[in-house]
C-alpha cells in the first residue's frame, strides 16, 4: 500500500490492516524458518506497510 492510500483510511481500518499485516508477517517468518518461503521480498514489503500504518496512526494522534 502507498502512504496516500493508508492516510485515506479511517483509524479502525488502519488498525485492522495493521493486524492483518502482522499476522501475515508471522506466517511469512514461519515459512522462512521451515524453508517454504519462495518470495523473500514479501517480508520487507509487509514490514514497510506496518511501519507506514504506524506512522499514519501517530500523525493522526498528534494532529488531534
From Swiss-Prot:
Gene3D superfamilies listed in its UniProt record: 1.10.287.310
Coiled-coil residue windows: none
InterPro entries per record: Ribosomal_protein_uL29, Ribosomal_uL29, Ribosomal_uL29_CS, Ribosomal_uL29_sf
GO biological process, one term: translation
An annotated Gene Ontology molecular function: structural constituent of ribosome
Keyword annotations of the record: Ribonucleoprotein, Ribosomal protein
GO cellular component annotations of the record: cytosolic large ribosomal subunit
Family affiliation: Belongs to the universal ribosomal protein uL29 family.
UniProt xrefs under NCBIfam families: L29
HAMAP family, sorted: Ribosomal_uL29
UniProt name for this protein: Large ribosomal subunit protein uL29
Organism expressing this protein natively: Lactiplantibacillus plantarum (strain ATCC BAA-793 / NCIMB 8826 / WCFS1) (Lactobacillus plantarum)
Source species taxonomy: Bacteria, Bacillati, Bacillota, Bacilli, Lactobacillales
Amino acid at each position: 500500500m502507498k502512504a496516500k492510500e493508508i492516510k485515506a483510511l479511517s483509524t479502525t481500518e488502519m488498525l485492522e490492516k495493521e493486524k492483518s499485516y502482522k499476522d501475515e508477517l508471522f506466517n511469512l517468518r514461519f515459512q522462512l524458518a521451515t524453508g517454504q518461503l519462495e518470495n523473500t521480498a514479501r517480508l520487507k514489503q509487509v514490514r514497510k506497510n506496518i511501519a507506514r500504518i504506524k506512522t499514519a496512526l501517530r500523525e493522526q494522534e498528534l494532529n488531534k
